[in-house]
C-alpha cells in the first residue's frame, strides 16, 4: 500500500520507499505482489474513537476503584481526563451503532483479505517525530477527537489493523 486506505498520500517518501523495497525483495523471492487497497471509508474513525473512548473510561474506573485514587485532573494526564469527561456522555445507542459500524469494517476487510496473504504498508506515514511533538500537553485546548484524527496522518494503517485484528508489523 503506497497510500493510506482512504487515498491520502504518506507525508514522507522514505516510508513509501521502504514499502517498495520490501515489495522488491518479496518479488525477487518469487512472490506475486499487487497494489490494492481495502474498501474503507475514512469515517470509520469516528466509530473507532467512540468505542475506544468508552473502553478507556471503563479501564480508568476499574483502576480508580482498585487503587482508591479519585478520577480527576490531578490523577490523570490532561488529555486522558478530557477524554474521560467527553466519553461519559456517550449514549448506549451511539455505542451500539459505533460497534455495528466497526463490525462492517471488519467484515469488509476480511472479505478483501480473502484475495491476499499479507498487506505491506508503512507503519508510520512520517519519519520519527522530535521528542515532545506527540505530546498532548503542548496543545491543551485541542479537542480529543481532533487530536486522535491528527494522529491518523502519522499512522494511517495502524487503526485499521487494531479494529480488525489484522496482523501488523
Which residues fall in each region the model found?
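A short alpha->beta transition loop at the rim of the catalytic pocket in nucleotide-sugar-dependent
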Residues: 165
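Conserved short alpha-helical elements in the N-terminal third of ANL/AMP-binding
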Residues: 160-162
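Gly/Ser-rich, acidic/histidine-flanked active-site/gating loops
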Residues: 1-50, 86-89, 94
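Short, surface-exposed loop/helix-turn segments at secondary-structure junctions
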Residues: 129-155
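A short beta-strand signature within small-molecule sensing/ligand-binding domains used
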Residues: 168-169
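Short helix-loop capping/hinge segments that flank enzyme active sites or metal/cofactor-binding pockets
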Residues: 1-4, 53-110, 124-127, 131-133
